[in-house]
Amino acid sequence: MIDKIKNEVRQLMFGNNDGHGFDHIERVYELSMKLVAEEKADKQIVGLAALLHDVDDYKLFGDDNAEKLTNARRIMEDNGVNTETAAKVCDIISNMGYSKALKGIRPQTLEGQIVSDADMLDAIGANGVIRTLAYALERCHSGNNQIFDKNIWPELFLTTEEYKKPDRPSDNFINHFFEKLLRLKKMMFTSGGRKEADIRHKFMVGFLEEFFRENNCPEWIEYLNKQK
């Protein structure tokens, strides 16, 4: 069943190159399997939630899908997932994600916490840098500088609505590290998640330090030292 669902998700997400494609989902699945091996949690529920956590993402499928979890519910029903398991998977998906965390909504079950950790881990470290850059480059066609503007500083206390707002002035590649990515280390639930997040966090800090050095931005290095 898992392999069949993987193939369906791969087809559904085909062509998405902004950091939320199947490659991201596959990494979240593998990270989830690694974390669940260290915890006493339901492996099937963790696996399903990991594979389906982005198939109704509001950035890709709109707010209506995100609220109803249309694709996740359909895929589970088509593959014979029982009602109780499907409900637990949907509860996990409904309670994870950074925009929800800004509202204080976090997963309450161990299974949900494992998938949340895996999802946030893939947002940081080397893969996180690549995903964030890919998303920024996708948006560069608008004519705005989506990479870095040394005169536009991050907004550190965004509400969910502000965070999701398109074309927000501070929303560029470098500022995204400060507005989200550097905060994720402290949002881990599991022991394994915290250990891996620490490694990936240090990589991002090193990347930013070198970026600011090469671009002769000592004021940004000072800012980073206050935030890291």
Predicted segments, located by residue:
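Onset of an N-terminal alpha helix
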Residues: 2-6, 22-25
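Hydrophobic, well-structured mid-protein blocks that either form specific transmembrane helices
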Residues: 82-116
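Divalent metal-dependent phosphate-bond-processing catalytic cores, especially two-metal-ion Mg2+/Mn2+ enzymes
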Residues: 13-22, 26, 30-39, 52, ...
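Generic N-terminal amphipathic, Lys/Arg-enriched alpha-helix
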Residues: 4-15
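His-Asp-centered metal-binding catalytic motifs of divalent-metal-dependent phosphohydrolases/nucleases
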Residues: 43-61, 68, 90-99
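An active-site-proximal "capping" alpha-helix that borders the catalytic cofactor pocket
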Residues: 28, 66-78
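Short, well-structured alpha-helical segments
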Residues: 22, 26-29, 47, 86-94
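Membrane-helix interface segments
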Residues: 41-43, 85
